Curated annotation (Swiss-Prot):
It comes from Musca domestica. This is Glutathione S-transferase 4. Its EC number is 2.5.1.18. Residues 87-208 form the GST C-terminal domain. GO terms for biological process: glutathione metabolic process. Conjugation of reduced glutathione to a wide number of exogenous and endogenous hydrophobic electrophiles.
């Protein structure tokens, strides 16, 4: 099973942790985005959208990290796997957290941080305030249960761990958020592959403007 990825990418790391939790060995293929590796013809044949992560499982190509995470559990996980249980309400809550992470939390971070290294712009305090609103939302969600979507580790925790560790790696302090801090300490100890996730997150430091 080929996995095209970049360690500093939070979406890639969320898939790596999912595979680790399921005991799946991935054939990791480092794709050097900053050198245009994603635009090479051989990769475009696999993924014309030229994004990572991309998984190829016996000829079946799939991209978008949350889609890959769900696919891996549904194909290789246990029946009613706790990572993504079969109960519609439990799945719905996990999905809500996954979409929140992708479309609100990490997007808020990207809006604030990416212009600083892509366009060499100074940090925008207003964009940071908007990002803090998304952290407030996450803090509220995490006040309701032990983990992100209930009392056991799920795909939601793995995706959110990849994001929050990225924030920490680029010196964004989440310790002032009581429930995020409690949850973050917990998942760093309980999420399979958390150490590899942190090592990848630290590569984000290379993007911090000097």
């Amino acid at each position: 099973m080929d996995f095209y990825y970049l360690p500093l990418s939070a979406p890639c790391r969320s898939v790596l942790m999912t595979a680790k939790a399921l005991g799946i060995e991935l054939n990791k293929k480092l794709l050097k985005l900053f050198e245009g590796g994603h635009l090479k013809p051989e990769f475009l044949k696999i993924n014309p959208q030229h994004t990572i992560p991309t998984l190829v499982d016996n000829g079946f190509a799939l991209w978008e990290s949350r889609a890959i995470m769900v696919y891996l559990v549904e194909k290789y996980g246990k029946q009613d796997d706790p990572l993504y249980p079969s109960c519609p309400k439990k799945r719905a809550l996990i999905n809500q957290r996954l979409y929140f992470d992708m479309g609100t939390l990490y997007q808020g971070f990207a809006n604030y941080f990416y212009p600083q290294f892509k366009e060499k712009k100074p940090a925008d305090p207003e964009l940071f305030k908007k990002f803090e609103v998304t952290l407030d939302f996450l803090n509220t969600f995490l006040s309701e249960s032990k983990y992100a979507a209930g009392d056991s580790l799920t795909l939601a925790d793995l995706a959110l761990l990849a994001s929050v560790s990225t924030f920490e790696a680029v010196n964004i302090d989440v310790s002032k958020y009581e429930h995020i801090a409690r949850w973050y300490a917990l998942v760093k100890e309980t999420a399979p592959g958390a150490d590899e996730n942190w090592a990848g997150a630290l590569e984000m430091k290379t993007l911090i403007p000097k």
